[in-house]
A protein has these predicted regions:
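Oxidoreductase and adenylate-handling cofactor-binding alpha/beta cores
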Residues: 126-142, 157-167, 291
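General beta-strand structural signal in soluble alpha/beta enzymes
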Residues: 90-91, 116-120, 146, 169-170
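Rossmann-fold NAD(P) dinucleotide-binding segment
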Residues: 55-64, 72-91
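NAD(P)-dependent Rossmann-like dehydrogenase/reductase catalytic/cofactor-binding core
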Residues: 262, 266-327
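Glycine-rich Rossmann-fold phosphate-binding loop(s) that bind the pyrophosphate
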Residues: 9-10
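C-terminal substrate-binding/catalytic lobe of Rossmann-fold NAD(P)-dependent oxidoreductases
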Residues: 3, 14-15, 22-55, 151-289
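Rossmann-fold NAD(P)-binding glycine/threonine-rich loop
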Residues: 92-116
Length: 327
């Protein structure tokens, strides 16, 4: 039985817990929190809730520690730190900083003989794998990634920080005409604005200046200024009724040419349509936690990404079973 620890019990932590329930070879040992442990109610009755201050006392009880913090400030510190004491896995998703994050985790894991697996989820993660396969198969081609329709939690948080905003959800929406142009194999060169729109649902405080809020949203650099953005003001009741879930998804498409004269076009498309972003991400992470455990048992250490994990490590099946039923 693979023993799992979870650090952080937000949306992703709960998604991890649900994913463990659907396995036969894993069990949740403990959830670690920065909050008062008595205030954190988990679903797994046989697992403990403990303070993060006590986490090092569990080194002999946990095979893989899943880190569920945010990529902005939590994971850059936590993953290298806990790789000194545990086999670790995270969902670090700041693409530009992955090489730096990898190097830090690699140094920590190498020094102590542990196994680190970073940036696991769907993007980075499943989308990354599909880009690699598609690039290998169609070297003469181009990649296109579309996200949505789905809730962007980072963009939603950015709106909530605006004065006068009580709550907000931001949906990233692919532009259908751009999607179809890519699917046709035309390989169009598309700007940010041409690929996605942003749709915002905002609960404003009583008496707040809605026009000012809308202007702040639409002109916010790095978030909305480069996109066609629509803002809808709704009530708290409408938000709870219609926008309480965290759906997401997207498409990774590569179109390319083969033949001596590049006469034949091909399109490879991978699509995700998710009711719950954190629950799906949790399911991906738990499959890779199994791989981390197995690879470490084979003597492998240091940092890895999804590119380094053979598919057979992900399944709770023998090699014979995989060949018989899935090949």
């Amino acid at each position: 039985m693979i023993r799992i620890g979870i650090l952080g019990y937000g949306n992703l932590g709960r998604g991890i817990e649900c994913a463990i329930k659907h396995t036969k070879d894993m069990k949740l040992v403990a959830v670690f929190t920065r909050r008062d442990p008595s205030s954190v109610k988990i679903l797994t009755s046989e697992a403990k809730v403990d303070s993060v201050e006590n986490i090092l006392s569990y080194q002999d009880d946990i095979d893989v520690l899943v880190l569920c913090g945010g990529s902005a400030t939590d994971l850059p510190v936590q993953t290298p730190e806990y790789a000194k004491y545990f086999n670790v896995i995270d969902s670090f998703d700041t693409h530009a900083n992955i090489p730096e994050h990898f190097a830090k985790v690699d140094d920590a894991a190498k020094a102590t003989g542990h196994f680190g697996l970073i940036s696991v989820g769907w993007d980075p993660g499943m989308f990354s794998l599909n880009r690699v396969y598609a690039n290998a198969i169609l070297p003469n081609g181009a990649d296109h990634t579309f996200w949505g329709k789905g809730v962007s939690q980072g963009h939603s948080d950015a709106i909530r920080r605006i004065e006068g905003v009580v709550d907000a959800r931001q949906y990233t929406v692919p532009v259908e005409s751009a999607l179809e142009a890519v699917r046709s194999g035309k390989n169009p060169e598309l700007t940010t604005r041409q690929k996605h729109t942003r749709e915002c649902y905002v609960v404003a405080a009583e008496g707040a200046d809605k026009a000012k809020i809308e202007e702040e949203i639409k002109t916010m650099p790095n978030y909305f200024a480069d996109y066609d953005t629509t803002v809808h003001f709704i009530t708290a009741e409408e938000m709870k009724k219609n926008h309480s879930k965290l759906p997401h998804g997207g498409f990774v498409i590569r179109s390319g040419k083969t033949g001596w004269e590049d006469e034949n076009n091909h399109v490879i498309e991978y699509r995700l349509k998710l009711d719950s972003n954190p629950e799906f991400t949790g399911s991906v992470i738990i499959a890779y936690a199994r791989a981390a455990y197995r690879m470490h048992n084979e003597g492998k250490i240091v940092a890895h990404t999804v590119f380094d994990v053979a598919p057979a490590y992900l399944l709770d099946m023998s090699a014979d079973e995989i060949r018989a039923h899935l090949l």
